[in-house]
Amino acid sequence: NIGTDIVAKAPADGYTLLMGVVGPIAVNPSLFGNLPYDPIRSFVPLTPVADIPVGLIVSARIPVKTTREFIQHLKANPTKVAYGSVGNGSFNHLLMEQFKTAAGVEMLHVPFQGAGPVANELIAGRIEASVLAPRGPWTAGQVNLLAMISTKRSPALPNVPAITEELPSFQPFGNWMGFFAPTGTPEAVVRKLSEAFNAALQQPDVRQKIEEQQWSVIGGSPDQFGK
């Protein structure tokens, strides 16, 4: 929120931009009543950059391989399973709470400061689950990726089911990132910046770096992003 507010108050000259993500722009306004910025009034959208897929990941110490098995495990062990997030009100906190509601289960929430500590505790087995980007040690047998938090399978991981395949009542929200400028930025500058970002997203080396993270390149106009 601090960085987002700094950009909101910056000169609207095209030289200070926000790489916005779903939390500060789309989620936090519903969680905090005293935000110093307004995501609609304080910014103009430039270009959506990427969709960032996340997955339901559990410790390998839990004897489950599917979302259904995980739900059964939770119902058999109520209040004994803890999940981690990158902080109160974060995207993975909210998604795990959505999962709990949809599945009718209980888990203890343990907030951390960043994804690194969550991953470390998950690998060590000191927490049992989280929603994180499916990369890093996830293929090394230390944890199990049960499902992608989406309504369709990821092209990067076609063998991993979408969570709605096993839990249809779960309706996940998207996890994206994109560029914004302070409100008042001249329209010509907005267009020029958007065109430059879209051109960059078409460069093979840029796309490769994004896709190496198992993200999906988006791109698009300010109007498309604003919708």
Locate each region found by the language model.
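Hinge/capping helix and adjacent helix->loop/strand transition within the periplasmic-binding protein
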Residues: 9-16, 30-117, 163-165, 172-209, ...
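Loop/helix-junction capping segments adjacent to catalytic residues or to phosphate/diphosphate-binding pockets
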Residues: 1, 25, 64, 90-93, ...
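Short, Asp-centered acidic motifs that coordinate Mg2+ and/or phosphate
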Residues: 14-18, 55, 128-129, 145
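Short helices/loops that flank or line small-molecule/ion binding pockets
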Residues: 2-12, 97-98, 102, 116-127, ...
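Extracellular/periplasmic bilobal clamshell ligand-binding domains
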Residues: 221-227
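Short beta-strand and adjacent tight-turn residues that come in two discontinuous sequence segments
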Residues: 17-20, 48, 112, 131-133, ...
